[in-house]
Regions:
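Pocket-edge structural micro-motifs
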Residues: 30, 99, 217
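Membrane helical hairpin/interfacial module
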Residues: 9, 30-33
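ATP-binding/phosphotransfer module of carbohydrate and carboxylate kinases, centering on a glycine-rich
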Residues: 1-24, 47, 68-73, 119-286
Length: 286
C-alpha cells in the first residue's frame, strides 16, 4: 500500500512541474528506520519508484529533526504516543535513542503513562499500592464492576496503542490536578524522558550552550507535570533553550531534499514552506 501511494504521488507530481524542470532529489522518511536506511530497506520501499541514486530513505525521526532544527545542531525530543530522541552534533552526526515502540517500552510516552495508570489501579485493587482515583475513574468509563473487568478490554485487538494514548489524555484531564498517584506517574514520565535526553546528548558529543532543545508530542505539549519534570531534569544538567519545532514534522523530508540539492535555507524559504503547508492542510480538511 505504501509503495502504491508513493508511486501515485510521483506520477501526480511530475506533470505539474514547470516546463523543462525536473526532480533532482527524492527524500522519503518512514517509521521503523533508525537514522539512515539500509540498502535492503531502500530497495523494498523505494525500488522502481524513484531514481536510485537521487533517492534517500531515512527514519521519520531524522526528518523530524530537520524540520525542528532546520538542520542545525541541537536536540529533538518527541514524546507523544511513543518516545523518540535525536541529537545532531556539530559534525552533522546523529545519535538516536528511544523509538522502540510500546512492546519494548517507549519510556515516558502516553502509552507508557496509560499502562502505568492501569497498573496503579491494579495495585490499588490488590492492596499492593496506594489508593488512587484512577481505579474508580476507569471503572466508571468502561462500565465495569471492578478493575478486573478491564483485562478483556485492553487485550482486545482493537485496543491499540493509539487508544492507550487517548486514555492517558483523558486521565490527565480528569485527574491531572487532583490525584497524587496519577500526578506522580506524570512527573516520573517527564523525569525519565529528561534522563534519556541527557544520555542522548552526552553520547552525541554535542556541546553547545545554551543547548537548543526542540520538543513535540502531546505529553510534553499538554501534560503540565510531565513537561515541568522534563524541563527541571534537563536544567539540572545543561543550560537549555526550549522551543517547539520550526516546521511541521512532515516537511522534514522536504528540508533534506532542498539541502541536498544545494538550496540555501533562509527565513523567507522557511516561512514560505510553513505557509504552503498550512494552506494545503486547510484545503484537505475542508
Amino acid at each position: 500500500e505504501v509503495r502504491r501511494r508513493m508511486n501515485e504521488l510521483v506520477h501526480e507530481l511530475e506533470p505539474q512541474l514547470p516546463f523543462s524542470n525536473e526532480v533532482v532529489r527524492y527524500n522519503v522518511s518512514a517509521a521503523g528506520i533508525f537514522n539512515e536506511a539500509t540498502v535492503d530497506q531502500k530497495e523494498k520501499l523505494c525500488g522502481k519508484i524513484y531514481p536510485w541514486k537521487q533517492t534517500r530513505l531515512v527514519g521519520d525521526s531524522v526528518a523530524g529533526f530537520q524540520a525542528a532544527t532546520l538542520g542545525k545542531p541541537g536536540v529533538l525530543v518527541i514524546c507523544g504516543t511513543g518516545t523518540s530522541i535525536i541529537a545532531g552534533n556539530l559534525d552533522s552526526e546523529f545519535t538516536h535513542r528511544g523509538g522502540w515502540g510500546p512492546l519494548l517500552d517507549d519510556v515516558g510516552s502516553a502509552y507508557w503513562i496509560a499502562v502505568k495508570a492501569i497498573r496503579a489501579a491494579i495495585d490499588d485493587f490488590e492492596g499492593t499500592g496506594p489508593k488512587t482515583a484512577i481505579t474508580s475513574t476507569l471503572c466508571e468509563w468502561y462500565e465495569i464492576k471492578n478493575i478486573q473487568g478491564i483485562v478483556p478490554i485492553i487485550y482486545h485487538p482493537e485496543f491499540n496503542r493509539a487508544k492507550f494514548a487517548i486514555l492517558a489524555s483523558r486521565l490527565d484531564k480528569a485527574l491531572g490536578n487532583t490525584d497524587d498517584v496519577y500526578q506522580g506517574i506524570c512527573r516520573e514520565a517527564g523525569t525519565e524522558v529528561g534522563k534519556l535526553t541527557i544520555h542522548t546528548v552526552e553520547k552525541s558529543g554535542l556541546d553547545i550552550s545554551p543547548m537548543p532543545v526542540f520538543f513535540s508530542g502531546g505529553v510534553l505539549l499538554f501534560n503540565r507535570r510531565a513537561q515541568k519534570a522534563f524541563e527541571e531534569t534537563l536544567r539540572e544538567r545543561f543550560q537549555v533553550m526550549l522551543s517547539q519545532p520550526r516546521l511541521p514534522t512532515v516537511l522534514g523530508s522536504t528540508m533534506l531534499a532542498l539541502r541536498e540539492a544545494g538550496v540555501e535555507i533562509t527565513d523567507k524559504l522557511v516561512d514560505q514552506l510553513n505557509s504552503t503547508y498550512r494552506n494545503v492542510d486547510e484545503l484537505t480538511k475542508g
